[in-house]
Curated annotation (Swiss-Prot):
HAMAP family: Sigma70_RpoD_SigA. Residues 1-10 have a biased composition (Low complexity). Residues 1-31 are annotated as: Disordered. One of its GO terms (molecular function) is DNA binding. Residues 238-313 are annotated as: Sigma-70 factor domain-3. This is RNA polymerase sigma factor SigA. Residues 327-380 are annotated as: Sigma-70 factor domain-4. Residues 159-229 are annotated as: Sigma-70 factor domain-2. PANTHER family: RNA POLYMERASE SIGMA FACTOR RPO, RNA POLYMERASE SIGMA FACTOR RPOD. InterPro entries: RNA_pol_sigma-70_dom, RNA_pol_sigma70, RNA_pol_sigma70_r1_2, RNA_pol_sigma70_r2, RNA_pol_sigma70_r3, RNA_pol_sigma70_r4, RNA_pol_sigma_70_r1_1, RNA_pol_sigma_70_r1_1_sf. It holds the Pfam family Sigma70_r1_1.
Amino acid sequence: MNEEQQVLQEQHQEQTQEQTQEQKETLPPQIERRIKKLISLGKKKGYITYEDIDKAFPPDFEGFDTNLIERIHEELEKHGINIVENEPEEEEISASSDEQELEELLEKESPEIHDSSNVRDSIKMYLKEIGKIPLLTPAQERELARRAQMGDKKAKEKLITSNLRLVVSIAKRYMGRGLSFQDLIQEGNIGLLKAVEKFDWRKGYKFSTYATWWIRQAITRAIADQARTIRIPVHMVETINKLNRLRREYYQKHGEEPSIEELAKMMGKPPEKIKEILEAAKETISLESPIGEDEDSSIEDFVADDSIASPKKEAMRMLMREELEKVLKTLSPREAMVLRMRYGLLDGKPKTLEEVGQYFNVTRERIRQIEVKALRKLRHPSRSKYLKSLLSLMDENEG
């Protein structure tokens, strides 16, 4: 490389750095305001806790990603503000014996979660096992992260296992909020995995500090999702059933779903009210979509029911699930996956149109169209007759 080329390369690098800096400095007003409040609070207290950051940027905050995490960290660091796990007085309280603390924490949970000594013993055994794993120094963290980024699976595994205690220490602080201790640990471990995937060792951050963001985010998001379980009042259920019936009638007549305005006319209610009803219904009636020429059966009939105690009935349901999968495979891969996600055939949890849309990176309306088309295909005699014969088999078994 001659001298002129070197000068041009250096100029290009400087321009790129300047552009990157300009992009970094430009923040949406709502984010900038929240960061300024954190800085102000940090200067007043002399530190910032993760709880302070959670309040400023809750789990459902739009735009929470790796870049935002790094930006918050940089801004606080720039002003000489340290991030600490807890308020100083809380740190003193948490210094008690681990085993005694665990017993007290488990006592606070609902009896049905931990009334089994086996559950308690398995938790204690898990804590004992991860307690044997030595903690890493910042230098070891960076080296393992560097190797993990290059595809070293053993380095990645060691980085994860060495931070399992961190997950437990964070999970303890969220007990009594709707999830069992085991579930909290599991969700926290998912956050830890995400942190390992996204950690950039070249930034100079301590991995455990960076991972704490993702662990807390995963746990608080899981708690928030749990809290969203909707209990619909009886009068609303009746309204939803009526709306559903009118939608089916309209679809049979016109071959397409009615618009909000058309539903409003049929129901004699304003469009805004129809939107409210649909919002309340989307998580609870998704399993009611009919299958079969006579529309006398639904997807719900094929979803495994964990409350069934009889091994014979459970085996029958498992068989039906397998047969349903065979039928779904006659659809296009996208149609089949949309139905699996919408009706909870993957994990027993139905997904909203928006959630499925995010998975496929398309609009809610596009997912609705795919779903309607797929259900129309399932109503074809070549498929629906087979499903109906399975239903009759199940009826005989239950009789």
